[in-house]
Amino acid sequence: MRGEWQEFKTPAGKKYYYNKNTKQSRWEKPNLKKGSNLESNAKESQTERKPTFSLELVNGWHLIIYNDGTKLYFNDDSKEFKNDISQEDDSRCRSLIESLDKEKLVLLIGVARGYTMREEDIDKILESCNEEIHLFKRNQDEVERKDEISEEAGDVKSPLQESHTGLVSGYGSSSGEEDEEEDEEEDEENEEQIVNQDISIIDDLNRIDTDDIDERNIFFELFDRYKLDKFSTWSLQSKKIENDPDFYKIRDDTVRESLFEEWCGERSGNATAEESDSEDNSEDDSEVLEPTKYHYLAQIVANAGTIAPDTIPQDIRKQQKALYKAYKIKEYIPSKRDQDKFVSQLLFYYKTFDLEQRKEIFCDCLRDHERDFTGAVESLRQDKELIDRWQTLLKAPADSSSIEDILLSIEHRCCVSPIVVTEPRYYVVGILEKTVVWVRWLAAEVGPSSRFTPVGAGNEPINPE
């Protein structure tokens, strides 16, 4: 498609068109004029391109982000523009670019292209980027200063060494015994200095290791105290704890994020170990709770934040790379092709329908498969005490693992896995919303069967190969 229009396909294969200017979608193909209009549109788009954000780097370089999402590097001294800066062009500037938080730069590009954010949030992102640049410059200056001091110390030491060598070689025969005694004393002093330096270095290393362990423990306690969601992303969960003083005991957000991912993996491992222990102690192996095939991949899509009309599965994989690894998506779905195919179908629902509409689509899915749930639905509905306990847990600020346990328990008792393995509608909401709708449906709180049938939703099965 040309100009302001983009063409997309639903999972069912039906085409629809998205207007980048109005942010609206339509089924009908727009009437596009050819010829001179295409050239004028191209010229117009070029003249409309304006710088939106500018970050001052080093050595006269600036990173400029334009309103169409493109970025260029401009040098004040040479007045030249570059699409990229290589090590050969400027190694220091290249190192700075690689050290910047890519997630923040992506957000700035998104805002430049029209993504809506609060002004104070944009200011925080810019302030954080400038702080990263300032810290990089300060660290580089310290490294250069230490190098200069080392070179100066080497220059001062060299004449002394040469002088000492000259004395030993020129006058050693005339004052032999005195020189030998002095040499022995100097050797002993040097050995003591070396030993003391080694002890000092070991103490420093031990202190560094202890500091790292302390910071790790502080952050793990912080995550536990605020009951962060181990199935969510750092960009979302960090907002819950950024006002706590302990949050700033580590200034590097990359280190914070790596600790969060480590905490998520450890908590997931602990949960698995507990399930394994209970499984060993239980005589009934049928109570082992296993998630459905697309359980975690669907949750990654649910946690992806704002999904743009042109988002593709590869974008989700790149943005959520850490979660793909943490939740071992490859073990559940070995084929990347099948992973992307499933994500592509979910993206259609997330682009086309809001959360409330997707909840209704999920509820329709439950109604359609009610007879397939092996009669367990009626049995659960009669267990009022269990449903009341679930509702109480959902109303309270329960942690994510408790909510997931409810969902897995329902799915296990209803034998959901073989039924929904090829049903995309079952995955159009996240774990929390899915659990809430399940419990409300079992409690018969969702009202009469008012069906929501989205046009072109393409409720075809996933059909993984």
Swiss-Prot record:
FF domain: residues covered: 212-266
Keyword match Nucleus: yes
Region entry Disordered, spans: 28-49, 144-198, 266-288
InterPro entries: FF_domain, FF_domain_sf, Prp40-like, WW_dom, WW_dom_sf
Listed Acidic residues bias regions: 176-192, 274-288
Record-linked PROSITE patterns: FF, WW_DOMAIN_1, WW_DOMAIN_2
Sequence ranges of Polar residues compositional bias: 160-175
Molecular function as annotated in GO: RNA binding
Chain ranges of the WW domain: 1-32
Keywords, in A-Z order: mRNA processing, mRNA splicing, Nucleus, Phosphoprotein, Spliceosome
Pfam families: FF (PF01846), WW (PF00397)
One GO CC term on file: prespliceosome
GO BP field: mRNA cis splicing, via spliceosome; mRNA splicing, via spliceosome
N-terminal signal peptide: none
Subcellular location: Nucleus
Function comment: Component of the spliceosome involved in mRNA processing.
PANTHER family: PRE-MRNA-PROCESSING PROTEIN PRP40 (PTHR11864), PRE-MRNA-SPLICING FACTOR URN1 (PTHR11864:SF30)
More about this protein: Present with 1310 molecules/cell in log phase SD medium.
The protein's name: Pre-mRNA-splicing factor URN1
Source organism: Saccharomyces cerevisiae (strain ATCC 204508 / S288c) (Baker's yeast)
